[in-house]
From Swiss-Prot:
Compositionally biased tracts (Basic residues): 9-18
Modified residues (3-methylthioaspartic acid): 102
Taxonomic lineage: Bacteria, Bacillati, Bacillota, Bacilli, Lactobacillales
UniProt keywords, alphabetically: Methylation, Ribonucleoprotein, Ribosomal protein, RNA-binding, rRNA-binding, tRNA-binding
Protein's recorded name: Small ribosomal subunit protein uS12
Species in which this protein is naturally found: Leuconostoc mesenteroides subsp. mesenteroides (strain ATCC 8293 / DSM 20343 / BCRC 11652 / CCM 1803 / JCM 6124 / NCDO 523 / NBRC 100496 / NCIMB 8023 / NCTC 12954 / NRRL B-1118 / 37Y)
Length: 137
């Protein structure tokens, strides 16, 4: 337990919290070729690789992912939610933060129904999360 004199000389430091989606915290100025300090809720990028990976124990599946080069020149791995997708190399995608618990290193989600990513076909529930239009009556 510090004395009051010690606290006067050197106050307590507040904890610095680390971002869970660091690639969204920076922009890029292509004229100056420098990173800028403007954060964004989503970022646009180009898929450089699309594939599947297996989750950690005890789960078993083939989870779809895309490696994305963002507009700020960061390269990140993003999860493709929903059943089926139309993404391939050079597709333009929009990503948001949000990790996938059983895929190590996947901290971002691709937003379905935005840019080149199509919504999930035949989806009836939670349609807004998967970019699906309302069914015809």
């Amino acid at each position: 337990m510090p004395t009051i004199n010690q606290l006067v000389r050197k106050p307590r430091k507040s904890k610095v919290s680390k971002s869970k989606s660091p690639a969204l915290n920076f922009g890029y100025n292509s004229m100056k070729k420098k990173a800028t300090n403007n954060a964004a809720p989503q970022k646009r990028g180009v898929a450089t690789r699309v594939g599947t990976m297996t989750p950690k124990k005890p789960n078993s599946a083939l989870r779809k992912y895309a490696r994305v080069r963002l507009s700020n020149l960061y390269e990140v791995t993003a999860y493709i939610p929903g059943i089926g997708h139309n993404l391939q190399e050079h597709s333009v995608v929009l990503i948001r933060g949000g990790r996938v618990k059983d895929l190590p290193g996947v901290r971002y989600h691709i937003i379905r129904g935005a840019l080149d990513t199509a919504g999930v076909d035949g989806r009836m529930t939670s349609r807004s999360k998967y970019g699906t239009k309302a069914p015809k009556k």
